[in-house]
């Protein structure tokens, strides 16, 4: 019966110790994490996009949004930028660092086993012939810190929060970079559109200057009209040159973002004439779900929320240092010793030069209890510092949420304004173009005034630029809404390594929330 009773007690102790791998064996000090409430309103205050083909989407549904642009060159710029970006690489490195910390935290709650092998050889004399002594030793040392009060489990929770936060920051870096590349690409196509407007304006003014010059030579137009026509033509050429310089600057920006050569960037931008001066068409979507649900999927908001979870767990880590610590240690060390040339000392030696061999086996096992007695308030101060850090993390989270709400609402306003203004500006452009055509015909027939013609030309030029501006603003507003809603990035080569899902355990002993916790 005794052996069976011993085995039952051993199994019971093993189950109890293993149960402490996720919670403290006796209790888990410190607050249990509770997700902070967001100050977001119940509904979006700004009107959602009114596009009929827009589909309702959560941020997780937007991971292939860039692919729906159906612009291979644009998508190539995105993937190249992701590949060479230092900000994305730094974020990925921080993930790996957090993963190492996670492995360390997981290992702290498990037994540790080390081995040691050594050999020692010596020669001694005691006023007589020398004898040699050799020892061979191999040992196993084991140590297991028992998580009595949950300090180790809190370390694991903190590591999980840190890893999840780093992963969200990596995602945020990728989305931010994708938006930056998209804006640069859109700016270049917009610049090309303005270039086309400027080129048409140059052609129109050059023809007007030529006709006015011929009329002036024939004495049909005064010198003032000839000078004004030439000045107008020169002004159009200067505007075209300025616009060309702006487009070249946009290309430099794409080169810096993608790491591609300028020759390759220019080739991809100009290889298909049908895409030149054509803004990409973003797939429309409508935000689905409550603002709080949407915002919590933004990577920056998720990162801030995970930092709150980490800070909450750090309180328990520091609090556990104020309680006793229990460790189980043990070792097994077999030894083999040989002694030669010791006939005078060993009753087993047959004669001079004979050798004797001894075998010994030693072991030890026992608990070690470490109890803090006096530290001049150091541990209590560290708990208070951890609690302050938690409050700061919670404040940063609320600030991030407010910023996210603002960005979504502003993007919705931008989009709605652009959608409402575009039809009006296009209608105005048609009217100005008709007015310019009529004025030009009158002037060519000799019934108009050059000043009226130039005024009609300027009005048409301004209207064309206004339409181009609003078309760009509409595309940029869609990109801004995608970014503000926390849209994802579909990586064709795979994403970051998967991360463990942080648990939200309940402490039946303390039953405390982080905001209520006092050391």
Functional labels for PLM-detected ranges:
Residues 328, 369, 386, 393, ...:
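Hydrophobic, well-ordered secondary-structure elements that form the walls
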């Amino acid at each position: 019966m005794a052996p069976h009773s011993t085995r039952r007690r051993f199994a019971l102790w093993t189950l109890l110790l293993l149960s402490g791998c996720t919670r403290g064996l006796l209790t888990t000090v410190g607050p249990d994490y509770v997700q902070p409430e967001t100050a977001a309103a119940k509904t979006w205050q700004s009107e959602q996009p009114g596009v009929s083909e827009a589909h309702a989407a959560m941020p997780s549904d937007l991971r292939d949004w860039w692919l729906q642009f159906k612009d291979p060159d644009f998508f190539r710029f995105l993937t190249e930028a992701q590949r060479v970006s230092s900000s994305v690489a730094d974020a990925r490195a921080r993930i790996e660092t957090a993963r190492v910390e996670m492995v360390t935290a997981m290992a702290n709650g498990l037994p540790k086993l080390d081995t040691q092998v050594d050999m020692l050889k010596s020669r001694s004399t005691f006023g007589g012939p020398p004898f040699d002594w050799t020892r061979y030793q191999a040992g196993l040392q084991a140590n297991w810190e028992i998580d009595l009060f949950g300090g180790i489990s809190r370390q694991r929770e903190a590591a999980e929060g840190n890893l999840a936060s780093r992963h969200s920051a990596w995602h945020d870096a990728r989305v931010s970079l994708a938006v930056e590349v998209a804006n640069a690409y859109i700016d270049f196509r917009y610049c090309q559109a303005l270039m086309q407007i400027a080129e048409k304006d140059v052609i129109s003014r050059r023809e007007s200057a030529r006709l006015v010059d011929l009329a002036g030579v024939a004495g049909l137009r005064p010198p003032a009209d000839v000078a004004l026509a030439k000045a107008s033509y020169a002004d159009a050429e200067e505007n075209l040159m300025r616009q060309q310089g702006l487009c070249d600057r946009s290309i430099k920006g794409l080169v810096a973002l993608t790491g591609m050569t300028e020759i390759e960037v220019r080739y991809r931008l100009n290889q298909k004439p049908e895409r030149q001066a054509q803004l990409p068409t973003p797939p429309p979507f409508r935000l689905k779900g409550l603002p709080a649900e949407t915002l919590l999927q933004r990577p920056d908001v998720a990162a801030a929320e995970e930092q709150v979870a980490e800070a909450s767990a750090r309180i328990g880590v520091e609090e556990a240092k104020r309680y006793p610590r229990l460790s189980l240690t043990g070792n097994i060390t077999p030894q083999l010793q040989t002694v030669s040339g010791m006939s005078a000392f060993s009753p087993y030696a047959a004669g001079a030069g004979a050798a004797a061999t001894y075998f010994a086996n030693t072991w030890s096992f026992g608990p070690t209890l470490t109890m803090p007695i006096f530290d001049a308030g150091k541990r209590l101060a560290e708990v208070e510092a951890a609690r302050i850090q938690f409050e700061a993390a919670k404040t940063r989270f609320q600030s991030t949420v407010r910023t996210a709400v603002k960005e979504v609402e502003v993007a919705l306003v931008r989009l709605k304004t652009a959608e409402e203004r575009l039809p009006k500006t296009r209608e105005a452009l048609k009217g100005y173009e008709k007015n310019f055509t009529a004025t030009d015909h009158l002037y060519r027939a000799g019934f108009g005034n050059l000043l009226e013609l130039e005024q009609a030309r300027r009005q048409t030029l301004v209207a064309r630029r206004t339409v181009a501006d609003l078309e760009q603003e509409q595309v940029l507003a869609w990109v801004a809404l995608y970014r503000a809603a926390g849209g994802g990035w579909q990586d064709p080569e795979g994403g970051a390594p998967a991360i463990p899902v942080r648990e939200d355990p309940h402490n039946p002993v303390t039953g405390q929330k982080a905001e209520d916790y006092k050391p």
